[in-house]
A protein has these predicted regions:
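Flexible "arm" and connector segments at domain edges
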Residues: 1-58, 62-130
Length: 130
């Protein structure tokens, strides 16, 4: 697997290669269990104050999530691109609402921003079901 690939694409190819020879979970539930395990290891490293170990565990978590995408026949790059676009849309909504209220983002509370975020989600959901 070429080392020049973006990390997420390379992880997908590495996991696909391993799966082809049987080094894999029987189904997506096994991968989800692995994701939970890796997330717990991130938390343990953070609780121990070990930033370097936490970063290593985040890498393991990302790799496990890439495996989940593979078991769902999803392209992890496309999944992330879609989520990036969704995040950007919603964050622009938050910015727009605060701007309309003449409220600088830097002065808005997290609760206030979260309320606008949830409104953006609700608006998206309503427009997709219309």
């Amino acid at each position: 697997v070429p080392r020049t690939l973006p990390a997420l694409s390379r992880a997908a190819k590495l996991s696909k290669r391993a799966a082809r020879v049987g080094f894999d979970w029987p189904d997506s539930k096994g991968v989800i269990a692995k994701i939970r395990e890796e997330l717990a290891e991130v938390e343990e490293a953070l609780d121990a104050g070990d930033q370097q170990h936490a970063q290593e565990e985040v890498g393991d978590l990302l790799f496990a999530v890439t495996n989940l995408a593979r078991t769902l026949n999803a392209d992890p790059e496309q999944c992330l691109r879609t989520t990036n676009a969704k995040f950007e849309r919603r964050f622009r909504y938050v910015e727009g609402e605060l701007s309309a209220a003449q409220r600088p983002l830097t002065e808005a509370s997290l609760d206030e921003m979260e309320a606008h975020w949830q409104a953006a989600k609700a608006e998206e959901k309503q427009s997709t079901h219309s």
